[in-house]
Regions:
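Sec-dependent N-terminal signal peptides
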Residues: 3-13
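Exported/periplasmic ABC-transporter solute-binding proteins
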Residues: 17-43, 47-52, 56, 60-66, ...
Length: 251
């Protein structure tokens, strides 16, 4: 009898265990990992699988049938389109407002606060920027360059990253001298130790309001709804603030 009860208990726990598959914009690489760790300690029966990339790439993959349960975009547009086209079951909900910075390594000898003049420094051969066609942070960075009237002057120096995380890796590795990345990446310990940055004024680009949705695939999982709601909690909002995000409704 004891063996039967033990078997039933184990079977029940296995049924309850769920993997939440999340596609997230690359600017969330550090913040969302920390959030997921906190969540899984709180709900050990759930596991979270995180995939990071450009918002446009995640959008296209979900439309093509990728089995993601929650989609975190670096803007509202992609999340809204998924909802309108029936690929998401929840209306897009803003979770953070992103900021962009001009970042360089401490040993580069460059001062990012001397923007935009620093971009024209003869020592600067390559400037990293995310692809503005499908990466919201890349689009905001291009808008900032245009606002300062230097885009045409530096366009031949631009090195295009697939997403904002790849863009950061270009600068950190020396493949680019400096470049535009998300503040949330610049504040991560591994980048904060080796680099310095200048915060681009918000009025130089469109606001980076970021939204998330539960996908059509995710509606089958109670755990997906649980994590979705956790992201709006006070505990989660503290993590977003830690990584430099502004919070909707608190401005």
């Amino acid at each position: 009898m004891r063996l039967i009860i033990l078997f039933l208990l184990l079977s029940f726990s296995l049924v309850k265990a769920e993997v939440i598959r999340v596609f997230a914009a690359a600017d969330l690489q550090f913040a969302l990992r920390e959030l997921a760790d906190i969540y899984m300690k709180k709900y050990p029966e759930d596991k979270i699988e995180l995939i990071f990339g450009s918002s446009g790439k995640g959008f296209a993959q979900i439309k093509a049938g990728a089995p993601y349960h929650i989609f975190f975009s670096a803007d509202m547009k992609y999340a809204e389109e998924l909802y309108k086209e029936g690929y998401a079951i929840t209306k897009p909900k803003p979770y953070a407002i992103g900021r962009i910075v001009l970042w360089t390594r401490k040993d580069s000898g460059l001062d990012p606060s001397k923007f935009p003049e620093v971009l024209l420094d003869p020592r600067v051969k390559r400037i990293a920027i995310a692809n503005w066609d499908h990466a919201p942070y890349g689009k905001a960075s291009k808008e900032a360059l245009e606002a300062y009237g230097v885009f045409q002057k530096v366009k031949d120096k631009l090195v295009i990253g697939e997403n904002i995380a790849q863009t950061a890796s270009y600068i950190r590795s020396g493949a680019a001298d400096l470049g535009f990345i998300a503040l949330s990446l610049a504040k991560a310990p591994e980048l904060e130790m080796v680099g310095r940055y200048w915060l681009v004024p918000e009025d130089k680009h469109k606001r980076i309001l970021q939204g998330y949705v539960i996908t059509k695939e995710g509606q089958k999982f109670v755990s997906a709804r649980r994590f979705y709601e956790f992201v709006a909690s006070k505990e989660a909002r503290k993590v977003f603030t830690k990584y430099g995000f502004l919070l909707p409704g608190e401005r």
